[in-house]
Each structure stands twice: as C-alpha cells, then as structure tokens.
C-alpha cells in the first residue's frame, strides 16, 4: 500500500483538498431513514464507538458491536461498555457477514488489521464506514471494489457527540464518500443518514472529502488544538513558579484558564475573547500574538508541509512498527513536567474574569495559534469552513480535557495519532516559547493584571479592525450563526 494522496496528480490533489460544501438543512429532510431496517455493526467501542452507537440506536437504527474474541472472553472495557448499555455483542465471524454497514471506529493504528479481518467476511455490496480518513488517505488502504466507503467525522470528542445529542442538538460534522468506492452511487445517502442519526445535521454538516478531512484534522490537532496548549501550559506554569507564585495557584490558573478563555471563542470568536480584556491588556495581547507568530509560524508551516507530503504519516507509522517507542517516551516525559505534578488548588478561588486578566499571554497564544493554523490550512488549498472547524471550533473542547485532568486527560481523550503529532509540535515549540516569549514577559502579562496605560484611540481602533477582519473571524461569524439558528430550531421542538 502507498499513500493515496501522493498517487493523485496535482489537479486531483487540489480538487480533493478543496472539497467543502456547507449542506442545506433541507438535504436532511429524510433523516436517517435510508439506514432504517439495515444491520449496522460497529467495530470498536471506545469514546466515538460507544457514543455514536448510542445516538444511532436512539435514532431508530439497528446497532450491534463486533469485538475481538479475547475482548469478549476476557470481558475487557469495550465489551463492558457495549453490554452495560444493552447492545448486542459478537465476534467478527458472528456479526459481519450479515451487516449492511460496518463502521470502523477503532484507533488509526488498528485500521489495517481490522480491514484485513472484516473484509473477507463482508457480504457483496455492503458498506464500510470511517470517522477519520487516515487509513484510506495516508496508509492507502485498498477496499474491495463492490464495497461502498463513506466517512462521517464529528468535530468533537465522543462524549460531546453524546451530550449534544441528548440535549436535542448535535455537533458539526464532515461527511465524505471515497471516490474509488461508490459502486452503486449510494455513498452520499448512507453518509447523510449516518450523520443525521448521530445528530450532526442539527448542528451543520460539511460535504468534504477523505483527503480534506485528514489533512485539516491532522494540522489542527498537532498545532493549535493540542500542541500549542501543551507547550503553553508547560512554559506558563514554569514562569509563574519562577516568579514566586504559589504553585497551586499557578497550576489552577493554567489548568482551568484555557477552558475559561476559549469558552469566549465558542460564543464570539477571537473578537469576543479579546474583548474580555481591558484596552491596555488587549493591546498587549495583540502585540504578544504578533511576536509569537514571528517565532512559531515556521513551525506551523512545517507541520502543514509534512502533513501534505506524507512525511508526518511515514514518521509516525515507523514508530508504530517500532512499538510506539517515541510515543511512549514522550508520554512519560509529559507526565514528569512540573505542570502535570502541580499541587491541588484546594480552597483557591479564581473568578472568571481573573483568568483573562492574569492570563494575557495565554490569550495571545490562543489568538496567534488559531490564526496561524487557519492561515496555513487555507494557504494549502483547504477551504475556510474546514479550517475553521479544525482550529477555532474544536479548541474549547480540547481545553475542557485539560481542565479535567491536565495534559494527561487531553492525551488520553485524543487519538494516538493526535498525541504523536502533539509531541512533535510541542517538543519544538516549548523551548522556543520559553526563550523568545515567556522569558521576555513584562509585568501584567502573566499572573497579575496589565497595568492601565494611556490609550491611543487610533492604534486601538486599528487593532480592533485587524482582529475582526481576519478571515477566521469572518467565516466563524457565518458558521456560528448557523449553529445558533439550529439551536433555536431544536429548542422549539
């Protein structure tokens, strides 16, 4: 097998990268009816597997789980999750032959083994689904010609997919059909029905491609979503403690600060996040963000280039073959950082506004990181809608994992693929941020409020205009408006 993207000519590459269409609500008028009465078998019962399955069952679909024999006999976590929620569970041999749609929701590194095991068992003309296209695009998996291959990729962790569905909404979702595997022309109907069953059509669906989803997803998770948060957490905590701050206070400011700060992104983008600062602090955050871009933009572009070329995937798959030696070593090193071992902040109170006032450089890191990731994706041919979802939109969700159990929780919740890319980025970004940004911070940049200063009205006006007119803000306003409309529709019943 060889990297599918690299087998395409330039025109085909640009076409696949640029596949992005925001679908109309009317296109989902039939809901998930196309899949009703069909047997759907999910392989894997982790966060995405369980929660998508719960949503699909609640939408009226026939869902069961195919697990490896040892997972069943040893009653492993996947078996317990499925059975405790009342699902039928069986081996591949028991369930796959009668399945109309097999959905592969195992980790990326297991996909080739899953395909090799289930493909001979699948009936003629069945369908095969993914929620991430890595196996097709980067590994170059070849699927039987009679099988339809589709993707439904919720832009949230599995737990969020379930919680949003339970409150009558959903999460933004990308869907795609693999052009090499749509023999009956039913791929889009299957993908739409699957997305509707998970609740994705209530929040907005992008018709994309396997290529666009993979390249943008890898870029977002490696840089702003995980890598920047990890690097920022480590250097900001170290700086606070070095400046004499109580380690417990420093740990809490960082651990919960990302979540509080990025919650503003969800409601009003970078504009609202920056508006939470005083004028003096906003100016300083803007200036710090520009400095961060000067020192880190090369790294964002390198990651984008390595993702497009396939260099990243080749490097990671070599580590898979080596027993994940690098991944495990980096994971262990992260667990030993001072931030991860900061004392608990029992009794320490930090108000919502204090997280903004005492975290100006954190706000700057978020602003710079979102804009650099978005710009790098768009410059590489990825459409703005996809770039928005893979940078700004998912950030509050990842920040929430840090609030729960710091970097450990983030790296547990995200995939091994995301975790590996996170370390590649943060291992380089951390010393750069420490030397070029954090060591140069002024009073009021971190740990205490920015001192009030005389404000140049013209300078402030220009900064505000620059913030509000960045392309990520313009497309974000449009997409968030759609989601607001959808929430209003769902709340009315």
From Swiss-Prot:
> What's an example of a GO molecular-function annotation for this chain?
ketol-acid reductoisomerase activity
Give the enzyme's EC designation.
1.1.1.86
The cofactors named for this UniProt entry are: Mg(2+)
* Keywords, alphabetical: Amino-acid biosynthesis, Branched-chain amino acid biosynthesis, Magnesium, Metal-binding, NADP, Oxidoreductase, Repeat
What's an example GO cellular component term for this entry? cytosol
Cofactor note, please? Binds 2 magnesium ions per subunit.
Catalytic activity as recorded in UniProt: (2R)-2,3-dihydroxy-3-methylbutanoate + NADP(+) = (2S)-2-acetolactate + NADPH + H(+); (2R,3R)-2,3-dihydroxy-3-methylpentanoate + NADP(+) = (S)-2-ethyl-2-hydroxy-3-oxobutanoate + NADPH + H(+)
Catalytic residues at: 132
What top-level class of enzyme does the UniProt entry assign? oxidoreductase
Give the PANTHER family listed for this entry. KETOL-ACID REDUCTOISOMERASE, MITOCHONDRIAL (PTHR21371:SF1)
Protein name stated in the entry: Ketol-acid reductoisomerase (NADP(+))
Gene behind the chain: ilvC
């Amino acid at each position: 097998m060889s990297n599918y993207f690299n087998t395409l000519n330039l025109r085909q590459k640009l076409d696949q990268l640029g596949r992005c269409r925001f679908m109309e609500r009317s296109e989902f008028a039939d809901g998930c009816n196309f899949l009703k009465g069909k047997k759907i078998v999910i392989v894997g019962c982790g966060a995405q597997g369980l929660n998508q399955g719960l949503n699909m069952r609640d939408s009226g679909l026939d869902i069961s789980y195919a697990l490896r024999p040892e997972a069943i006999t040893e009653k492993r976590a996947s078996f317990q999750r499925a059975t405790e929620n009342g699902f039928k569970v069986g081996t591949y041999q028991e369930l796959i032959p009668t399945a109309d749609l097999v959905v592969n929701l195992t980790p990326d590194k297991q996909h080739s083994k899953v395909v090799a095991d289930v493909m001979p068992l699948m009936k003629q003309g069945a369908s095969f689904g993914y929620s991430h296209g890595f196996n097709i695009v980067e590994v170059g998996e070849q699927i039987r010609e009679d099988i339809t291959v589709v993707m439904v990729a919720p832009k949230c962790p599995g737990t969020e997919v379930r919680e949003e569905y339970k409150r009558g909404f959903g999460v933004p979702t990308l869907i795609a059909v693999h052009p090499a595997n749509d023999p009956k022309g039913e791929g889009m109907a299957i993908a739409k029905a699957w997305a509707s069953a998970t609740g994705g059509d209530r929040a907005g669906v992008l018709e994309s491609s396997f290529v666009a989803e993979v390249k943008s997803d890898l870029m977002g998770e490696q840089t702003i979503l995980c890598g920047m948060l990890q690097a920022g957490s480590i250097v900001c905590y170290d700086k606070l403690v070095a400046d004499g701050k109580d380690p417990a206070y420093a740990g809490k400011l960082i651990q919960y600060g990302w979540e509080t700060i990025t919650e503003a992104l969800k409601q009003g983008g970078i504009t609202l996040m920056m508006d939470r600062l005083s004028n003096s602090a906003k100016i300083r955050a803007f200036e710090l963000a520009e400095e961060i871009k000067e020192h880190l933009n090369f790294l964002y572009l390198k990651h984008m280039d390595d993702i497009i070329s396939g260099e990243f995937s080749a490097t990671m798959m070599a580590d898979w073959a080596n027993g994940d030696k690098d991944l495990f070593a980096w994971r262990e090193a992260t667990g030993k950082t001072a931030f991860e071992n900061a004392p608990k902040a029992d009794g320490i109170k930090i108000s919502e506004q204090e997280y903004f006032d005492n975290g100006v450089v954190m706000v700057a890191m978020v602003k710079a990181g979102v804009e650099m990731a978005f710009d790098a994706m768009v410059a590489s041919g990825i459409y703005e809608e996809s770039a928005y979802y893979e940078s700004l939109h998912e950030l509050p969700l990842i920040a929430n994992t840090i609030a729960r159990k710091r970097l450990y929780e983030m790296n547990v919740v995200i995939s091994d693929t995301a975790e590996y890319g996170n370390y590649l980025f943060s291992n380089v970004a951390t010393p750069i941020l420490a030397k070029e940004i954090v060591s140069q911070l002024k009073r009021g940049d971190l740990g205490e409020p920015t001192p009030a200063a005389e404000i140049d009205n013209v300078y402030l006006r220009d900064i505000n205009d620059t913030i509000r007119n960045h392309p990520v803000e313009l497309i974000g306003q449009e997409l968030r408006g759609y989601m607001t409309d959808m929430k209003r529709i769902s709340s009315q019943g």
